[in-house]
Amino acid sequence: MNSPIFVHMDTTSNVVLSRGIQAKDFQRGLIHRPNNLLLLNPASLDGEFENHTNLKVIKGSFAVEQFLQNMSKRRNNQDVRWIDFTDLTMIKELSALEISELLYLGHMKTHLHSPFFYKLQNNFVYFDLGDDLLRVYYRYIEEFYRILVPNKLLGLFTKN
């Protein structure tokens, strides 16, 4: 039996709060695959330390794919939060204000200003809130529908 799906979508800030959509659904449905990740959890054991932001990064599409696959295997109690970015050199160009916004975003799991940074060229900000609850910011909100429809809604109408 399929569990119910709950979705709250804010199209002003392009954020989706959902229950019943899992990390594996997110990972399977992505069209714009992240090249690099900046981990917003300072206690994360994954990634390499980046000294300009004092956060950890996962570099390269292969390492990111492995992280995303492992992310779907984690238990609900593990704190996963990240923002993707395109160019590693631009991390070093972030201002103190931009870094403080990233720290706020990671700590409070909500945004002060736009969660989409010009220097990072990010498409996603991802928060696993536990208890099967996700908050994801999408640069292109249509990406959420590509995750929801094939992975969840179509599954409701097919027999296992």
Regions found by a protein language model. Give the residues of each.
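Structured alpha/beta or helical-core interaction and ligand-binding surfaces enriched in interleaved
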Residues: M1-N160
